[in-house]
Amino acid sequence: MKYLAAYLLLVNAGNATPSAADVKAVLSAADIEVEEEKVEKLISESDGKNVEELIAEGNEKLSSVPSGAPAAAAGGASAAAGGEATEEAAEEEAAEESDDDMSFGLFD
């Protein structure tokens, strides 16, 4: 991530096609240890592409990642079935909370 951040920083500063040396210079200026192979991979994969293309490519990859929505839907179904129990538990909890202070008010 730090390599991509350095790359994007350089592009934002006006360098349309940062080189590996440019990325290394930015990271070194921030006292970040540089791994040559990661910098080279970033430069080779971004060669010939502009930042908008890279962002669009990343969005496509992220959209294919499962988000876990089915688990939330299953939880919603069980909550709908047990709605009355939830309301009773909430009322009971509120009653317990009022007894917790044992009639000792903080600002009395």
UniProtKB/Swiss-Prot annotation:
InterPro entries named in the record: P1/P2_N_sf, Ribosomal_P1/P2, Ribosomal_P2
Keyword Transferase: no
Cellular-component GO terms for this entry: cytosolic large ribosomal subunit; ribosome
Keywords annotated in UniProt: Phosphoprotein, Ribonucleoprotein, Ribosomal protein
Gene3D superfamilies, per database record: 1.10.10.1410
MF terms (GO), sorted A to Z: identical protein binding; structural constituent of ribosome
Cell division in keyword set: no
Region annotation (Disordered) ranges: 62-108
GO biological process: cytoplasmic translational elongation; protein heterooligomerization; protein homooligomerization
Modified residues (Phosphoserine): 98
Biased composition (Low complexity): 68-84
Amino acid composition bias (Acidic residues), ranges on this chain: 85-102
Matches recorded under PANTHER family: 60S ACIDIC RIBOSOMAL PROTEIN FAMILY MEMBER, LARGE RIBOSOMAL SUBUNIT PROTEIN P2A
Entry's family note: Belongs to the eukaryotic ribosomal protein P1/P2 family.
Role, per record: Plays an important role in the elongation step of protein synthesis.
Name listed for the protein in its UniProt record: Large ribosomal subunit protein P2A
Source organism (scientific name): Candida albicans
Gene: RPP2A
